[in-house]
Amino acid sequence: MKILILGAGRVGSSLASTLSRQEYEVSIVDLNKDKLLRLQEDYDLATEIGHASHPITLEKAGADKETIVLAVTNSDECNIASCQIAKSKFNVKKTICRLSDSAYLESLEAFGKDNIDIAIGPENEVTEHLVDLIKHPGAEQIESFANGSLKAVSVKARKDGMLVNRELKSIKSDMPDTDTFVPAIYRKGKPLIPDGKTIIKENDEIYFLAAESDIDSIVQEMRLQDTSSSRIMIIGGGKIGSALAKGLEDDYKIKIIDPDKDRCEVLSRELNRTIVLKGAGSDEELLKSENIENIDIFCALTNDDETNIMSAFLAKKLGAKKTIIIVNNYTYINILPKNFVDIALSPQRLTVSMVLQHLAKGDVPQEVIFKMQSGAEAIEGIIHKNKFTEEFFDKPISELPLPDGCVIAAVIRADEVYMHSKNLLLKPNDKIIVFILGKTDKEKIENLFLTD
């Protein structure tokens, strides 16, 4: 499959890295020669220097009817124009367009019928994730599956957790009426597929599946539950900061800080119950005057990673109970000290997940990357009768020939969810959620979801 990536920024480079390691013929376009040279040195791909929306550039990059175009530059307008030209002039197979401005997302028909096949709005996705994390304190990552009926949750085990230093199967006796399944644990950065006799240890990174209503009680098994939050301070009144404030202000006490006077005036008009303050998140006197020591959750959501990191450090030093930040450079994620930054959310990871979902072979409603560097992800797909699935029907799940590092975490059949289902026999058209840990043959999993 031919993939043409437009834009070699963080998202484009991450896509190039991920897709070039799979069975794709990847080309990438950017105006920055140095970025393209680095990518060409590191990965098996082709590069083209030029403007992403220029017809000659697209032609030189190989755009044709077999090409899928991923327009992920930092300019919505460039992405839109690129998709229009790629479709109308080169009749490309599919266009996927990254759009930051929700106004564009709501007006796709204005750009011509069929010019943009799939539009993705990472800012909306980031906001939804932030809301989930604020509503479920203690969880470090929450992803939705099965149309929202199941959540995959990451939580770090602490020594005060009820299940720590006990066997995993003890969760059933602790919570007999709660249905959950733990498909993966990361211990000291390395993945393991647990069983009932696995001892939960402090600092284990545990992934579990459960209904949203059960998340908080399961988190409490792994760590002492954080106290409920009512006071939230947001640094950055951009698209994400303002959307988060708007989504939470009816249920929480919100303060939002932005250095731009004009932006503050806009926020004051758009928000009803949020206190809007002009200033910087790194202004110690401002934070003290706004009683930072009483803030339950401090969210640094500007477009500048360093500002977000330093603001979170300062807020924690001054007494904020919990810090959540946005980090655009994913390499920062693994080096941030947890005593200052509780949760770092990566728009880059979310965008790559959204794109991969639409590139997946077969019938795949959802695909989520949990860890970009280690390759951990989960795929929700519908298993069909085809030449690859002959050995997968009329056999217990425990006997299926899955690649190493893969586990079927749940089966959804006629709106019924089955977990702990080692003896369940798969049927055609079952929806399954597969966790893939580390480097494994992902194509073998995707082949299960092919329709013929």
Describe each PLM feature range:
Residues 1-452:
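Cytosolic regulatory regions of ion transport systems
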